[in-house]
Amino acid sequence: MLSQKTKKKHNFLNHGLSLNLVIKPYLALEGSVAFPAENGVQDTESTLEKRETGDEENSAKFPIGRRDFDTLRCMLGRVYQRCWQV
C-alpha cells in the first residue's frame, strides 16, 4: 500500500491550490467580459423586427434566373470556376 505522502505526490491536480481557484469557468465571468457582444445582439434583434414589419404587398419582386444564382454562388466562392465563365 502507498502512504499518504506518495498518493499526494502522484496526484497531478494537487499543487497547493484547489482546482476551482486556478481555473474559473466561462460562465462565472461577469458583465461584458463573458459576453462582449451582448449589446450588439439586442441591436440585431430590433433591426430584424424592423425589417420583418415591412409592407409585403408594395415590395418589388424581380424574376431571378439560374444565371443570377450562378453569379451569386461565384461571388460567394462556393464554386470552382471564374465568375466570367458563368
Swiss-Prot record:
Residues 68-86 are annotated as: Melanin-concentrating hormone-like. Expressed in testis but not in brain. It comes from the Eukaryota. Signal peptide: none annotated. GO terms for cellular component: synapse. Residues 31-49 are annotated as: NGE-like. Residues 40-60 are annotated as: Disordered. GO terms for biological process: chemical synaptic transmission; negative regulation of synaptic transmission, dopaminergic. Residues 52-64 are annotated as: NEI-like. GO terms for molecular function: melanin-concentrating hormone activity; type 1 melanin-concentrating hormone receptor binding. Belongs to the melanin-concentrating hormone family. This is Putative pro-MCH-like protein 2. It comes from Homo sapiens.
